[in-house]
Amino acid sequence: CCPISDIVGVCLAIRDWLLFMSSDKSYSTHLSIEELLEQFSKGSSSKRRSLIRTVEERVDEISLLGYDSLSIFDPEGDDWAAGWILQVQQRHKPDELRKSFSVDSKGWFKTHSLVGIDYLPFQKALISESFEEADRFTSSTLRQLAGEAAESRGYVYFSEVKNMPGDDLVTLDRLWRAYSQGRFGFSVQAKLLGSLGGRYDRLWPRIGWKED
């Protein structure tokens, strides 16, 4: 949630709240669960956001579908609707969610690493909405990708990014976007930073990392 001292943030928060409240609950609750998931996956951005609460309310039906609840989504993609479906099942039906995936599963979203990094702990943290843990994993992974010097000093220089494996950066970015309703990720924050004139002091409040 954006701090109220940021006028732009307030406007965005109000917009999201209105979209949230605009959900036609009487209509969406009469959809079959398959129809609901179809609209949640293919509807307009505003329609999808208006169905967020309904999807969570019908998690019992979704969990009964098992792995098929995600059959209309692409595991190579970054669709936050798929991420949300996984998160609400983790919130309310964790045992059923575990049964839907094999014991040796690497997570529903496919991940790629050129240096052998295991992204399963990262996906587990994001599915469980343990975002601080996910952030620590991200920071640690970036240092690892940058090399021994970055690991020793504890942070990454901008100049080191160009030498990082692209597949790993894409994987981190995809998973953040998929499990944050499209609000977080390197590409999302870069776009937002550009809209703020490159000012980090304005970025931190907008993404909820700092309140004025």
Question: Where do the language-model regions lie?
Answer:
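Cysteine-centered motifs
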Residues: 1-2, 11
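Structural detector for internal amphipathic alpha-helices that build alpha-solenoid repeat scaffolds
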Residues: 20-26, 49-58, 80-92
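Amphipathic alpha-helical scaffolding segments comprising HEAT/armadillo-like alpha-solenoid repeats
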Residues: 27-38, 60-73, 95-109
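Generic helix N-cap/helix-start motif at coil->alpha-helix transitions
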Residues: 29-30, 42-50, 76-84, 113-115
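Hydrophobic/aromatic side-chain positions at a characteristic register within alpha-helices
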Residues: 40-43, 126
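Conserved positions within tetratricopeptide repeat
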Residues: 49-52, 64, 83-86, 98, ...
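C-terminal-biased regions
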Residues: 89-90, 97-104, 108-116, 120, ...
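Short helix-adjacent coil turns
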Residues: 128-134
